Amino acid sequence: MSFKFEAEVRSAQGKGASRRLRHNGQVPAIIYGGKAEAVSIILDHDKVNNAQAHDAFYNEVLTIVVAGKEEQVKVQAIQRHPTKPKLVHLDFKRI
């Protein structure tokens, strides 16, 4: 099973901006590693939440399309809300 997500570059940083994203059904994330700079991105919460229900999401290489460029990544860390079934933040590491 392969996973491919469309992402936007996130320009607004900080707690308030992240809360606004989550309120709008999006989740903040970051892609880092390799020789390229780290990129803060925005993903659709429901698509990622549905995908993470599969074990393959954690073990396989994922494809994230950011500004027309495909990034091959693996999940490095996921932060979840303590009482709600919501994702708070994701970290991806480039392959």
Curated annotation (Swiss-Prot):
Instruction: Give the keywords, sorted.
Output: Ribonucleoprotein, Ribosomal protein, RNA-binding, rRNA-binding
Xref: InterPro entries: Rbsml_bL25/Gln-tRNA_synth_N, Ribosomal_bL25/Gln-tRNA_synth, Ribosomal_bL25_short, Ribosomal_L25_dom, Ribosomal_uL5_bac-type
Look up the record and give one Gene Ontology term from the biological process aspect: translation
Q: Which Pfam family would be a valid example here?
A: Ribosomal_L25p
Q: Name one GO cellular component term.
A: cytosolic large ribosomal subunit
Q: Which GO terms describe its molecular function?
A: 5S rRNA binding; structural constituent of ribosome
Q: What is known about what this protein does? A: This is one of the proteins that binds to the 5S RNA in the ribosome where it forms part of the central protuberance.
Similarity annotation? Belongs to the bacterial ribosomal protein bL25 family.
Per UniProt, subunit arrangement is: Part of the 50S ribosomal subunit; part of the 5S rRNA/L5/L18/L25 subcomplex. Contacts the 5S rRNA. Binds to the 5S rRNA independently of L5 and L18.
Q: What's the protein name?
A: Large ribosomal subunit protein bL25
Please tell me the species this chain comes from.
Answer: Glaesserella parasuis serovar 5 (strain SH0165) (Haemophilus parasuis)
